[in-house]
Each structure stands twice: as structure tokens, then as C-alpha cells.
């Protein structure tokens, strides 16, 4: 089309997405599990209820407000696939700050360019990540990136591995120190439907990464509607999207969509082939996953090891299989299905 295309949703509407994803569930499903976290190590897992998640989000929101973060400010999140990633996203939304997540596997240069481009005032990271049995030096990478990011005033660091990392006086704060003594309630910032919710950068495969801005009202409706209807989600089911929160699929189908619908969402820190190539199917059995959403690349990689690693698991709980990220070839789909 020629000329400007402008699409606006519910333009005079006001909401805060965390009220839709958290507060409205407290009366009826406060003690239901919101997030099942499955660690890189198969022996590590935890569960967070809606009530617990709400409290943790409010505590971080209060800490961020105390650091001067205001509605419209940009906050960079550079975290592994741990509960804190979801808490950080929702805490930003709670106070009207715009989150910009950078995938934990990206380099200091990639992190720096994204922080500079969106002029972030706060970085939320961790000491280290874990991936396939190896440590990922997130704080070291962040410190390197921040040498060229004068806009960052504060850094909140989650203690994940307990690795020894440098902390800069006045700038860096341990997550627990910043949050643990904060009140467990926090007033949600009223947001216009067209107010920004997050920025996420394109992969950069076709030139410089571009920051794509997603607004509040239309995005949440789409996330909730598609999670409910595309996956035929039924109350009480366990939903697992294997994406990283660093990608838009992770934003939508690990955090915002499932939580808006009061679902139990699974968050996986690891990789499909660690410690064995049966890992996906073992996790499905362990947590009785009903809906499974993964990528053709992962399926094709697992196909190379044949059916034996799959068949040693039950997978009886599965009802729906989804594929995302690229077109799936018939051979991969038939093997998967």
C-alpha cells in the first residue's frame, strides 16, 4: 500500500497487563502453580504459584521504582531461562517500564548495541547462566558491554550459580538485597492500550538489528487468544513452549499468553540433548505436559538419533503438538507426530 498504515487497538482503553496475568487470578487460583521451572540439571526444578509470583513481581517493581525507574523508561533484561526472567518482565510491565530482552547467548557487543539503541536506564542480569552443563558468564559479558553504555544507572544481579563476579559499588545490586525487604504489593501503573509494553530486536540476519515495539492492548489480546484457541488450551493443563524468553515466541507463549489465561507454563533452562537426547521426552513425563510447542530445528536434530531415545519414555500425557519458528518439512512433522 502507499501512504501510512496505522492500526490502533482499543485506543481509549486502559489496563496493566500484570492485572490480567496475575491479580485477577489470585481469588480463584492463587495457590495454583503458575510456572514450573526445570533446570539444566535434571535434578533441579521448582514451582511458583500465582500468589508467589504476584508477590515477587511486586517486590521487584517496588525495588525498580526505588531506583528511579519510571513509566516509559527502558529496562534491559539479560538473563538465563530462570524464574527471575519472567518476574523481571512482569515487574517492568507493572510499573510501565518498557522491557528489552537480550538473549543470554548474545555477546557483549550485541548487548551493548541493544542497550544503546533503546537508551536503557537499568540492566537486570545474573551472575552466570547454565546451558548444556556449561556456565555462561553473563555478568562478565554485561560488565564488558556496559563500558560503552552510559545510560545505565543501576544493575540488578540475580544469584543463579553462586559464581564469583565483580560488583561495582553504587551501580550493582544483588537481586535479593534489592527485593527481599520490599512490600509484596505494588500499585500497577495504568497503561493506555497503545502504550509500549516491550521492545524486542530482530535477529540482525538482514542488516542491523531493528527494535520492534509491541504495545499493550493488542499484544495481550493476541497472546491470550492464540494461546487459548490455537492450542485448544483447557483449564488445568500443563503447557510447555521450549523457546527462550529472548525470542518473541518465549515472550508470548512462556509468559504473557499462558499467564493471561491462568495456565501452568513450563520454563526450561536446558537444551534438548543434555544430559541425553531423551531430555525433552523425560521432562514431558516428569511434569505430565499436555501441550508441547517446539521448533523444527530441534526436531530434526533429535531425529538423527532415531526413535529409541523417544520410545524409552511414555509421553502419555501429551494431547497437542505445536511447531514454530520456520516451516516444518513433511519428514520432520511425520516423525514428530
Swiss-Prot record:
Single GO BP term: acetyl-CoA biosynthetic process
Binding site for ATP: 325-327
InterPro entries the record matches: AMP-binding, AMP-binding_CS, AMP-dep_synth/lig_dom, ANL_N_sf
EC number: 6.2.1.1
Catalytic reaction annotation: acetate + ATP + CoA = acetyl-CoA + AMP + diphosphate
Cofactor needs: Mg(2+)
Keywords from the named record: Acetylation, ATP-binding, Ligase, Magnesium, Metal-binding, Nucleotide-binding
Gene Ontology CC annotations of this record: cytosol
Post-translational events: Acetylated. Deacetylation by the SIR2-homolog deacetylase activates the enzyme.
GO molecular function terms attached to this record: acetate-CoA ligase activity; ATP binding; metal ion binding
Function as written in the Swiss-Prot or TrEMBL entry: Catalyzes the conversion of acetate into acetyl-CoA (AcCoA), an essential intermediate at the junction of anabolic and catabolic pathways. AcsA undergoes a two-step reaction. In the first half reaction, AcsA combines acetate with ATP to form acetyl-adenylate (AcAMP) intermediate. In the second half reaction, it can then transfer the acetyl group from AcAMP to the sulfhydryl group of CoA, forming the product AcCoA.
Protein name, as recorded: Acetyl-coenzyme A synthetase
Gene: acsA
Amino acid at each position: 500500500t502507499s501512504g501510512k498504515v496505522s492500526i490502533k487497538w482499543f485506543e481509549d482503553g486502559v489496563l496493566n497487563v500484570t492485572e490480567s496475568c496475575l491479580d485477577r487470578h489470585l481469588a480463584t487460583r492463587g495457590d495454583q502453580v503458575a510456572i514450573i521451572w526445570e533446570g539444566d540439571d535434571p535434578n533441579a526444578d521448582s514451582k511458583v504459584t500465582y500468589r508467589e509470583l504476584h508477590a515477587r513481581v511486586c517486590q521487584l517493581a517496588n525495588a525498580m521504582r526505588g531506583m528511579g525507574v519510571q513509566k516509559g523508561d527502558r529496562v534491559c533484561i539479560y538473563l538465563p531461562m530462570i524464574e527471575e526472567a519472567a518476574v523481571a518482565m512482569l515487574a517492568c510491565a507493572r510499573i510501565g517500564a518498557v522491557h528489552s530482552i537480550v538473549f543470554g547467548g548474545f555477546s557483549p557487543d550485541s548487548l551493548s548495541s541493544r542497550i544503546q539503541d533503546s537508551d536503557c536506564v537499568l540492566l537486570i542480569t545474573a551472575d552466570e547462566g547454565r546451558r548444556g552443563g556449561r556456565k555462561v558468564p553473563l555478568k562478565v559479558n554485561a560488565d564488558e558491554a556496559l563500558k560503552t553504555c552510559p545510560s545505565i544507572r543501576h544493575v540488578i544481579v540475580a544469584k543463579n550459580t553462586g559464581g564469583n563476579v565483580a560488583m561495582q559499588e553504587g551501580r550493582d545490586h544483588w537481586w535479593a538485597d534489592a527485593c527481599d525487604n520490599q512490600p509484596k504489593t505494588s500499585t500497577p501503573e495504568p497503561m493506555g492500550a497503545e502504550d509500549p509494553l516491550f521492545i524486542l530486536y530482530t535477529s540482525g540476519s538482514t542488516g542491523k538489528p531493528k527494535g520492534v515495539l509491541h504495545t499493550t492492548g493488542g499484544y495481550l489480546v493476541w497472546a491470550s487468544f492464540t494461546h487459548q484457541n490455537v492450542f485448544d488450551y483447557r483449564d488445568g493443563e500443563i503447557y510447555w513452549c521450549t523457546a527462550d524468553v529472548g525470542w518473541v515466541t518465549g515472550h508470548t507463549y512462556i509468559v504473557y499468553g499462558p499467564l493471561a489465561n491462568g495456565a501452568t507454563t513450563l520454563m526450561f533452562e536446558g537444551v534438548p540433548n543434555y544430559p541425553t537426547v531423551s531430555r525433552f521426552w523425560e521432562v514431558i513425563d516428569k511434569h505430565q505436559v499436555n501441550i508441547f510447542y517446539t521448533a523444527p530445528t530441534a526436531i530434526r536434530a533429535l531425529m538423527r538419533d532415531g526413535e529409541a531415545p523417544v520410545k524409552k519414555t511414555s509421553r502419555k500425557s501429551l494431547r497437542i503438538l505445536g511447531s514454530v519458528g520456520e516451516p516444518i518439512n513433511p519428514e520432520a512433522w511425520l516423525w514428530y507426530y
